[in-house]
């Protein structure tokens, strides 16, 4: 019975990823595009770009060819095969599409966002996939999450970065808004990047999340944040966020209802980080061009 349940869980995950790829690969007929007005044609082309890139992102995922006692999923990023243990009964121990989008962005934009020797912290690291990719790209990484998730997080990070990463990643507890001055004193923190994937959803700690962003940011810190929009509550968080930070939409994935943002503290923008163009999703040999 246990073996059957494991098989059912893994087959469900396979089907889920296959469906995402299938949906991401749907295009309008060329004749239909020809009959559209120019503005609609532009939207159609952008929709096609979005679906093409989403399909490429989802193709980075694979599942085991055999049933294992512990469910895991595989990913190809930063030139490595990454294996992630999940716990499907916990939000923080499942790989969500937002994490895949952020991993793909980091990998395909290494010139604009070079992580080598940079100090990077991920909040709400969950399974650790984003932190693993950042580490494999050369960053000093601190992966953080709630205490009950740290065991699985540490296991995944150690398993996938040992002997592979330039710098050994750290795993630390971070409950948003709790003991920030004690655990992350402002005088000693100096993060170049804050990474966050799908940390905004219908939970009661959005104000604490905002406080945490503000506490961890220096005037030159860059936040790379991927967000899936689900409810009006999330839109209100974005409004609150923009009171403290200059927020720039880098890219949008309508087929996933996901947006990728870059942010820095308001009125403190350094000349080192000029305004960038929208990240246009154009796959060229598996890469994206700005």
Swiss-Prot record:
EC number of this enzyme: 2.1.1.-
InterPro entries: Methyltransf_16, SAM-dependent_MTases_sf
Keyword Repressor included in the entry's annotation: no
Positions of S-adenosyl-L-methionine binding: 96, 124-126, 145, 176, 197
GO biological process per UniProt: methylation
Cysteines joined through disulfide linkages: none
UniProt keyword list: Methyltransferase, S-adenosyl-L-methionine, Transferase
CDD domains: AdoMet_MTases
A matching Pfam family: Methyltransf_16
Function: Protein-lysine methyltransferase.
PANTHER family, A to Z: HEPATOCELLULAR CARCINOMA-ASSOCIATED ANTIGEN, METHYLTRANSFERASE-LIKE PROTEIN 21E PSEUDOGENE-RELATED
Family membership: Belongs to the methyltransferase superfamily. METTL21 family.
Name of the protein this chain belongs to: Protein-lysine methyltransferase METTL21E
UniProt organism field: Bos taurus (Bovine)
């Amino acid at each position: 019975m246990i073996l059957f349940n494991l098989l059912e869980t893994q087959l469900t995950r396979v089907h889920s990823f296959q469906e995402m790829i299938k949906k991401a690969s749907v295009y309008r007929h060329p004749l239909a595009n020809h009959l559209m007005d120019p503005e609609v044609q532009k939207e159609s082309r952008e929709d096609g770009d979005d679906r093409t890139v989403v399909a490429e992102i989802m193709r980075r995922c694979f599942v085991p060819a055999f049933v294992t006692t512990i469910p895991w999923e595989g990913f190809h990023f930063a030139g490595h095969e990454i294996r992630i243990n999940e716990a499907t009964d916990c939000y923080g121990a499942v790989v969500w599409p937002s994490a895949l989008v952020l991993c793909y962005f980091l990998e395909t934009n290494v010139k604009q966002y070079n992580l080598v020797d940079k100090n990077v912290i991920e909040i709400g690291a969950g399974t650790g996939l984003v932190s693993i990719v950042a580490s494999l790209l050369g960053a000093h990484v601190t992966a953080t999450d709630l205490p009950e998730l740290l065991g699985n997080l540490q296991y995944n990070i150690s398993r996938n970065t040992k002997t592979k990463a330039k710098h050994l990643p750290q795993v630390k507890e971070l409950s948003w808004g709790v003991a920030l001055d004690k655990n992350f004193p402002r005088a000693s923190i100096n993060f170049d990047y804050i990474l966050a994937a799908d940390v905004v959803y219908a939970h009661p700690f959005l104000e604490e999340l905002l406080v945490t962003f503000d506490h961890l940011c220096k005037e030159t810190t860059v936040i790379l944040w991927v967000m899936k929009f689900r409810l009006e509550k999330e839109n209100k968080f974005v409004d609150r966020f923009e009171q403290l930070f200059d927020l720039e939409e880098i890219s949008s994935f309508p087929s996933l209802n996901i947006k990728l943002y870059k942010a820095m503290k308001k009125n403190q923008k350094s000349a080192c980080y000029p305004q960038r163009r929208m990240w246009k999703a154009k796959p060229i040999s598996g890469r994206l061009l700005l």
